[in-house]
Amino acid sequence: MTKIKADPDGPEAQAEACSGERTYQELLVNQNPIAQPLASRRLTRKLYKCIKKAVKQKQIRRGVKEVQKFVNKGEKGIMVLAGDTLPIEVYCHLPVMCEDRNLPYVYIPSKTDLGAAAGSKRPTCVIMVKPHEEYQEAYDECLEEVQSLPLPL
């Protein structure tokens, strides 16, 4: 005689968990307090597409250490930060560096999605996208929208 355990969530919750996809609203729950300005759902998708194009041209900088090094060297681009990175101290100095150097930056909801867009199996908390003529139109569109976002106080 064996006991049959009832599934507390039901079959629809189990099917949702198997899909692996989380909605934008679910991702916003895990945001840290400094994640401002936060990209909209539409802008987030555009940024992911731009990042994928930049990866093909090898025009991205990935990770806190690499991004910080090239920002200090004067490299230009859009900085995309993951809003669910903890502890905050890992990358809280990067927005200040961007503001000092007039670089546009934006937060997106998920570090796992950011890493996946960059072609990595690992989560990535910060990526800098550099301009390139192959995807200049998509880059300019993202740059315009990121610059129009209000900066935090």
From Swiss-Prot:
Keyword tags: Disease variant, Dyskeratosis congenita, Isopeptide bond, Nucleus, Phosphoprotein, Ribonucleoprotein, Ribosome biogenesis, RNA-binding, rRNA processing, Ubl conjugation
One term of GO molecular function: mRNA 3'-UTR binding
GO biological process: rRNA pseudouridine synthesis; snoRNA guided rRNA pseudouridine synthesis; snRNA pseudouridine synthesis; telomerase RNA localization to Cajal body; telomere maintenance via telomerase
GO cellular component: box H/ACA scaRNP complex; box H/ACA snoRNP complex; box H/ACA telomerase RNP complex; chromosome, telomeric region; nucleoplasm; sno(s)RNA-containing ribonucleoprotein complex; telomerase holoenzyme complex
Annotated compartments: Nucleus, Nucleolus; Nucleus, Cajal body
Cross-link (Glycyl lysine isopeptide (Lys-Gly) (interchain with G-Cter in SUMO2)): 3, 5
Record cross-link Glycyl lysine isopeptide (Lys-Gly) (interchain with G-Cter in SUMO), residues: 5
Tissue expression as described in the entry: Expressed in brain, colon, heart, kidney, ovary, pancreas, placenta, prostate, skeletal muscle, small intestine, spleen, testis and thymus. Also expressed at lower levels in the liver.
Domain of life of the source: Eukaryota
InterPro entries, A to Z: eL8/uL1-like (IPR050257), H/ACA_rnp_Nhp2-like (IPR002415), Ribosomal_eL30-like_sf (IPR029064), Ribosomal_eL8/eL30/eS12/Gad45 (IPR004038), Ribosomal_eL8/Nhp2 (IPR018492)
Phosphoserine modification, residue list: 19
Crosslink site: Glycyl lysine isopeptide (Lys-Gly) (interchain with G-Cter in SUMO1): 5
Main localization, broad class: nucleus
Family: Belongs to the eukaryotic ribosomal protein eL8 family.
Function: Required for ribosome biogenesis and telomere maintenance. Part of the H/ACA small nucleolar ribonucleoprotein (H/ACA snoRNP) complex, which catalyzes pseudouridylation of rRNA. This involves the isomerization of uridine such that the ribose is subsequently attached to C5, instead of the normal N1. Each rRNA can contain up to 100 pseudouridine ('psi') residues, which may serve to stabilize the conformation of rRNAs. May also be required for correct processing or intranuclear trafficking of TERC, the RNA component of the telomerase reverse transcriptase (TERT) holoenzyme.
Quaternary structure annotation from Swiss-Prot or TrEMBL: Part of the H/ACA small nucleolar ribonucleoprotein (H/ACA snoRNP) complex, which contains NHP2/NOLA2, GAR1/NOLA1, NOP10/NOLA3, and DKC1/NOLA4, which is presumed to be the catalytic subunit. The complex contains a stable core formed by binding of one or two NOP10-DKC1 heterodimers to NHP2; GAR1 subsequently binds to this core via DKC1. The complex binds a box H/ACA small nucleolar RNA (snoRNA), which may target the specific site of modification within the RNA substrate. During assembly, the complex contains NAF1 instead of GAR1/NOLA1.
Annotated disorder: Dyskeratosis congenita, autosomal recessive, 2: A rare multisystem disorder caused by defective telomere maintenance. It is characterized by progressive bone marrow failure, and the clinical triad of reticulated skin hyperpigmentation, nail dystrophy, and mucosal leukoplakia. Common but variable features include premature graying, aplastic anemia, low platelets, osteoporosis, pulmonary fibrosis, and liver fibrosis among others. Early mortality is often associated with bone marrow failure, infections, fatal pulmonary complications, or malignancy.
Name this polypeptide is given: H/ACA ribonucleoprotein complex subunit 2
The species this protein was found in: Homo sapiens
